Amino acid sequence: MKLNNISIYLVVSALLCASVNLSAQKVVRYDLYVRDTLVNFTGKTKRAIAVNGQIPMPTMTFTQGDTAEIHVYNELKESTSLHWHGLILPNKEDGVPYLTQMPIEPGTTHVYRFPIAQNGTHWYHSHSGLQEQIGMYGSMILNKRNDDLTFRKGIDDLPTIPVVISEWTDYNPNNIHRMLHNATDWFAIKKGTTQSYAEAIKEGHFTTKVKNEFKRMLAMDVSDVYYDKFLLNGNQE
């Protein structure tokens, strides 16, 4: 009899705790509209992808313990997706097409819903093709709960102002990807970081130049991409 009473007590206690946790959860909703747009950062008009009319995508703010509910409206002529970089969440919400979900097809809506299980500054981006390179990236701020034992008053309650630094190139991202795989020195030449044999001889480094040629890596491994502009929160630096 006593064992039965204890069992009933434990079950009731667990249910009460669960109901308290559920009532404490706050659902934070964002609506994201994905559309084609045109930008001009270099004097040339190029295609980009804007979300809610902006690049980068909107900064989304949550508090640890919240439930994120993100509605994605795909108004592109191609499929898309969103991946939450570094977040601990259910696998089905991870946003990788054909792996954890089907792509969000043109003209359709997809809802991501997951608990915010951590705090910190993170970012999210498209996981479809090379859409990230033309605008589909943004920041996420996950605030610490004020009842967290590690919460620092006067520090953790200060407003967070995200600064997103990114690069922009007028080249089509698919062309960049192809050129990198071709392993040419094109981007190094554009950056002015290559050295000819004549320059090596002039500087007295002919032997070093020859030795380096025998052990050099492929250009795609050592040459960064040449960018036309650097952007600060989507604006020219």
Segments and roles (model prediction):
Residues 25-237:
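Histidine-centered copper-binding motifs that mark active-site loops
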Residues 1-27:
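Bacterial Sec-dependent N-terminal signal peptides
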